[in-house]
Amino acid sequence: MTKVLLGFMGVGKTTVSKHLSMHCKDMDAIIEAKIGMSIAAFFEQHGEIAFRTIESQVLKDLLFTNDNSVIVTGGGVVVLQENRQLLRKNHQHNILLVASFETLYQRLKHDKKSQRPLFLKYSKEAFYEFYQQRMVFYEGLSDLVIRVDHRTPEEVANIIEGY
């Protein structure tokens, strides 16, 4: 069964996936190859709704492949009801990586490379509300929750591989 890594933007899903011995499919990389530009540029040119539509199709395609790989999702994959339904069908194989809000905020604030559109859009207070809303979805879909604040990516990868 395919395992799915879930978590808020900046939690380390992509970083952890690089330490897994299992085959990983990074949705953001797949989407960027499909659209021919960065996600940030696509957001700016076409908007979030257009992006979520593509993201949903990619998730569906990857889940139906069912090849014992790990799908590394983007932080907003839980936004659409359709995606949450797809993830519920993957019951017992959804893994949530969790970090404290302050850890995430500092990572995103200092990440000059990614410049995530939804992070740049909000004040810290509004971003916290956004974080809390998303966490409700993640927690409702997750079968294993791994706190990453005081763990190395290698330690998190070992937990995932043992699950």
From Swiss-Prot:
It catalyses: shikimate + ATP = 3-phosphoshikimate + ADP + H(+). Its cofactor is Mg(2+). GO terms for cellular component: cytosol. ATP binds at G10, V11, G12, K13, T14, T15, R116, R151. It is an enzyme of class 2 (transferase). Keywords: Amino-acid biosynthesis, Aromatic amino acid biosynthesis, ATP-binding, Cytoplasm, Kinase, Magnesium, Metal-binding, Nucleotide-binding, Transferase. GO terms for biological process: amino acid biosynthetic process; aromatic amino acid family biosynthetic process; chorismate biosynthetic process. Disulfide bonds: none annotated. Its EC number is 2.7.1.71. Belongs to the shikimate kinase family. Monomer. PANTHER family: SHIKIMATE KINASE, SHIKIMATE KINASE 1, CHLOROPLASTIC. This is Shikimate kinase. It comes from Streptococcus pyogenes serotype M4 (strain MGAS10750). The gene is aroK.
